[in-house]
Amino acid sequence: MAIILGVDPGSRITGYGVIQCQGRQQLYLGSGCIRTSGEDLPLRLKQIFDGISEIIRQYQPDEFAIERVFLAKNADSALKLGQARGAAIVAATVANLPVAEYSATQIKNAVVGTGRAKKEQVQHMIQQLLKLPAAPQADAADALGVAVCHYHTNQSLVALSGRATTRTYGRYR
């Protein structure tokens, strides 16, 4: 039984989602957004660090997963996004959590089945997968998608490693 914290980083809005995994079942624990205020980037980064640190204290996750930086519309946006990711990753590292990173395409593929899914499709599938009464807001849904992607990736690796070491009729499978 593992608790996974997924994060969708942003310099203005950072989404988070927490799921608990029991066998093949994924249970929703919580989600939301850290909304930063002000124009001072160092202050916004501190707000992200403090927010993620508080979520870690509240939910006590075993694992941390975050979306990788994608190619932004301009260099300044990409740099700010990278710094927001860094603040979240440092919060996880301070809490001694293992950090996993996934591309947007990997996340959408794990949740929807196609790497080119739209935000609305991700929201809908997260609602269905986690049996939520309503679709979560976009940033929180993306963060829950990161957590679900991490869970599925781990399940696949466990299955593959199990098969690779299982000997049947004198052959390895």
Swiss-Prot record:
Gene3D superfamilies, per database record: Ribonuclease H-like superfamily/Ribonuclease H
Cofactor(s) it depends on: Mg(2+)
Q: Which SUPFAM superfamilies does the entry mention?
A: Ribonuclease H-like
List the keywords (alphabetical).
Cytoplasm, DNA damage, DNA recombination, DNA repair, DNA-binding, Endonuclease, Hydrolase, Magnesium, Metal-binding, Nuclease
Where, subcellularly, is it found?
Cytoplasm
Which amino acids does the record list as binding Mg(2+) 2? 67
The UniProt entry annotates the active site at 8, 67, 139
Record PROSITE patterns: RUVC
Which EC numbers characterise this protein's activity in its record? Answer: 3.1.21.10
Q: Annotated Gene Ontology MF terms?
A: crossover junction DNA endonuclease activity; DNA binding; magnesium ion binding
Q: What is its main location?
A: cytoplasm
Q: Which reaction does it catalyse?
A: Endonucleolytic cleavage at a junction such as a reciprocal single-stranded crossover between two homologous DNA duplexes (Holliday junction)
Q: Give me the residues that bind Mg(2+) 1, please.
A: 8, 139
Its family? Answer: Belongs to the RuvC family.
NCBIfam families recorded? PRK00039.2-1 (NF000711), ruvC (TIGR00228)
Task of the protein: The RuvA-RuvB-RuvC complex processes Holliday junction (HJ) DNA during genetic recombination and DNA repair. Endonuclease that resolves HJ intermediates. Cleaves cruciform DNA by making single-stranded nicks across the HJ at symmetrical positions within the homologous arms, yielding a 5'-phosphate and a 3'-hydroxyl group; requires a central core of homology in the junction. The consensus cleavage sequence is 5'-(A/T)TT(C/G)-3'. Cleavage occurs on the 3'-side of the TT dinucleotide at the point of strand exchange.
This protein's name: Crossover junction endodeoxyribonuclease RuvC
User: What is the species of this protein?
Assistant: Shewanella sp. (strain MR-4)
Question: What gene name does this entry carry?
Answer: ruvC
